[in-house]
């Protein structure tokens, strides 16, 4: 299967660098799937979106992202997120509680994004 270098980086920390067979992200233009050999592009990630990376080892990595950009070149896919949390790091009970008690729409949306990432990871 074809492979491409990829990385997911947030303002807080680098999350992952490796080789991927596909990347799926939610952009302001809609959900996009990127495979090796894809035409170059630059996309804006939606607030409260989900990014899925399929690694060359078959692993499925899923993260909740809060805005940022997706850059695709012939050599690499780069996801630059304002904020990102791995679905595997999400405490579902805590996220549900934060969603219910959120005082702002932003806080509620962040919790919802984390819960969507967990569901996508389990799918």
Curated annotation (Swiss-Prot):
Domain of life assignment: Bacteria
Protein name per Swiss-Prot or TrEMBL: ATP synthase epsilon chain
Membership in a protein family: Belongs to the ATPase epsilon chain family.
Keyword Repressor (UniProt): no
The gene coding this protein: atpC
Bilayer topology: Peripheral membrane protein
CDD domains named among the record's database cross-references: F1-ATPase_delta (cd12152)
GO molecular function: ATP binding; proton-transporting ATP synthase activity, rotational mechanism
SUBUNIT field: F-type ATPases have 2 components, CF(1) - the catalytic core - and CF(0) - the membrane proton channel. CF(1) has five subunits: alpha(3), beta(3), gamma(1), delta(1), epsilon(1). CF(0) has three main subunits: a, b and c.
Origin organism lineage: Bacteria, Bacillati, Actinomycetota, Actinomycetes, Mycobacteriales
